[in-house]
């Protein structure tokens, strides 16, 4: 048997990336395809329908564009014979969901629905279902639902049930016309294979499914809304299969589009961050993997099911078969730094960066690195896009304290870097306090490759060594590993994801170690961060929510005046 290859496709927030990998984990070729429609958060394409605040949609056709463009590109770049590609795997943002009809066609592609926002793909960061999430949590808590502690006591507005309920409340006709609500990762697998299967990862983390108990009871859904009573056996029906399972094989039509052979094995869908865990070679407990990009997803393996405040979930076999997979997260990290660079930096910084031939991020990082911990006099709460863990509240907002007339842009930048590190420390503390050990940190994604200052701050704030993924596209490599498992040993692949990770997972030799004097200062700053965190985040002062409410009320009044 000659040399064999697998392809992993990572569907991110703004683009899709295909990576062609050999069975030793060497990356042979990669290609990024930006989504033509990007993130739709202001106006629907073609119809000019205005979207309300907190909406974030996507066009499902963009996902197919990635298959049609990126896969042929990596084959062409590498010169690899398509016959030597034994499997394809994908990972996706989640919960990114869409309504489809009985043939599997997204409702937004039908002429009668294209002007209706609720027919489109709801991206993971669509936060307009917060009212439904609040009521769901209130009812679940009153009923003493057993599932609630598994999700840190709160179900997020980002997840499947809240989003479905929002559709039912605001567009009941679209709900009625929907045959299935699908995770986008499962829909793309359906398009590739013709097989409609749901993966255990998104079902467990985003749809309140449990390996032993299944979905919550009909009685619970009836208590939410009588119209939801039969949701799980109708619009959420379908087999739920473990990660690493073969979903099916490429159809002739899709193989022709992608430049591969019909019959090529396709792994069940996965979540971007979760695919990154084997991507860095982590297949055992005690090693926290941080997938760092626009947001951070924190993943950890355990041998028991423990209840931890603010977790996105604990799911048996949810990341690596044989372990309980814990997920936590921060709703905005890279997005905060990008916001500051785009919206908050004075013109002279942009001009200076341009003159030096560096990006604004690099210019700020270089100057921020000259400061010692505490020297900026600033402290921030990293809630620019709400708080995912441990407070699970999208209505919280960002805060910076300590400004003076002498505050410089690089000081603000450093304070924002530090704030996200404190947010990660809060998550680590929650794990440890509830009996789930965190001994080592692993970082992957775009940020660790770009920002050394950020990684040193994380090492100092958490007082733990951080290992960095060797790959710049770890989730795609992880997805490729699952493709190797789906292909099977008989076709040159692997027996299990553990075997695949041991042979294909890689980290850099360079690590970031905590600097003791920095650790001591950050410990004091973290105590202050915790006071702010609890004061503004646990109900003592809900000023952030009141401000958000007044903002929305004022906007609504302004819009109604414009319409009249």
Curated annotation (Swiss-Prot):
Biological processes annotated in GO: L-arabinose catabolic process to xylulose 5-phosphate
Gene3D superfamilies from the UniProt entry: 3.30.420.40
Pfam families in UniProt: FGGY_C, FGGY_N
Catalytic activity: D-ribulose + ATP = D-ribulose 5-phosphate + ADP + H(+); L-ribulose + ATP = L-ribulose 5-phosphate + ADP + H(+)
Pathway of action: Carbohydrate degradation; L-arabinose degradation via L-ribulose; D-xylulose 5-phosphate from L-arabinose (bacterial route): step 2/3
Keywords on record: Arabinose catabolism, ATP-binding, Carbohydrate metabolism, Kinase, Nucleotide-binding, Transferase
Leading EC class: transferase
GO-annotated molecular function: ATP binding; D-ribulokinase activity; ribulokinase activity
GO cellular component entries: cytoplasm
Documented EC number(s): 2.7.1.16
PANTHER family per the UniProt record, alphabetical: FGGY CARBOHYDRATE KINASE DOMAIN-CONTAINING PROTEIN, RIBULOKINASE
Family according to the record: Belongs to the ribulokinase family.
Protein's name in the database: Ribulokinase
């Amino acid at each position: 048997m000659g040399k064999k290859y697998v392809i992993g496709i990572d569907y991110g927030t703004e683009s899709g990336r295909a990576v062609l990998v050999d069975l030793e984990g060497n990356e042979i070729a990669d290609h990024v395809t930006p989504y033509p429609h990007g993130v739709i958060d202001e106006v629907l394409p073609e119809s000019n329908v205005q979207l309300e605040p907190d909406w974030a949609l996507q066009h499902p056709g963009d996902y197919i564009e990635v298959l049609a463009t990126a896969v042929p590109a990596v084959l062409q770049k590498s010169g690899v014979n398509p016959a030597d590609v034994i499997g394809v795997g994908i990972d996706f943002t989640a919960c990114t969901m869409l309504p489809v009809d009985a043939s599997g066609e997204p409702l937004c592609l039908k002429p009668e629905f294209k002007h209706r926002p609720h027919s489109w793909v709801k991206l993971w960061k669509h936060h307009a279902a917060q009212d439904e999430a609040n009521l769901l949590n209130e009812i679940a808590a009153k009923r003493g639902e057993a599932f609630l502690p598994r999700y840190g006591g709160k179900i997020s507005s980002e997840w499947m049930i809240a989003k479905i309920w929002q559709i039912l409340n605001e567009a009941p006709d679209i709900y009625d016309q929907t045959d299935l609500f699908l995770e986008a990762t499962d829909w793309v697998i359906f398009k590739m294979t013709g097989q409609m299967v749901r993966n255990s990862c998104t079902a467990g983390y985003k749809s309140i499914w449990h390996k032993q108990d299944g979905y919550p009871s009909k009685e619970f859904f009836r208590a939410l809304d009588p119209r939801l009573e039969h949701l799980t056996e109708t619009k959420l029906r379908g087999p739920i299969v473990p990660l690493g399972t073969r979903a099916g094989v490429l159809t002739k039509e899709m193989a022709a589009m992608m430049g591969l052979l019909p019959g090529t094995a396709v792994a069940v869908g996965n979540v971007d961050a979760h695919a990154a865990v084997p991507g860095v070679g982590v297949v055992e407990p005690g090693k926290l993997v941080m997938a760092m990009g626009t947001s951070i997803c924190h993943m950890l393996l355990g041998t028991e099911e423990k209840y931890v405040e603010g977790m996105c979930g604990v799911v048996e076999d949810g990341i690596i078969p044989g372990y309980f997979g814990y997920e936590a997260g921060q709703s905005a990290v890279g997005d905060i730094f990008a916001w500051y660079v785009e919206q908050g930096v004075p013109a002279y910084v942009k001009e200076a960066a341009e003159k030096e031939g560096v990006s604004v991020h690099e210019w700020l990082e270089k100057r921020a690195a000259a400061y010692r911990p505490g020297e900026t006099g600033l402290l921030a709460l990293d809630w620019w896009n709400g708080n995912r863990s441990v407070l699970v509240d999208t209505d919280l907002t960002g805060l910076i304290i300590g400004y003076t007339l002498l505050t410089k842009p690089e000081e603000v930048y450093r304070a924002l870097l530090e704030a996200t590190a404190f947010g990660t420390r809060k998550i680590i503390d929650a794990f440890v306090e509830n009996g789930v050990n965190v001994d080592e940190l692993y970082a992957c994604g775009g940020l660790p490759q770009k920002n050394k200052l950020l990684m040193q701050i994380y090492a100092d704030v958490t007082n733990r060594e951080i290992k960095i993924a060797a790959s710049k596209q770890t989730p795609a490599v992880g997805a490729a590993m699952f493709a190797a498992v789906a292909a099977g040993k008989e076709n040159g692949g692997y027996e299990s994801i553990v075997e695949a990770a041991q042979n294909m997972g890689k980290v850099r030799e360079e690590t970031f170690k905590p600097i003791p004097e920095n650790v001591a200062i950050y410990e004091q700053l973290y105590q202050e961060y915790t006071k702010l965190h609890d004061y503004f985040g646990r109900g003592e002062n809900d000023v952030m929510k009141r401000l958000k409410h007044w903002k929305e009320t004022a906007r609504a009044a302004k819009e109604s005046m414009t319409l009249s």
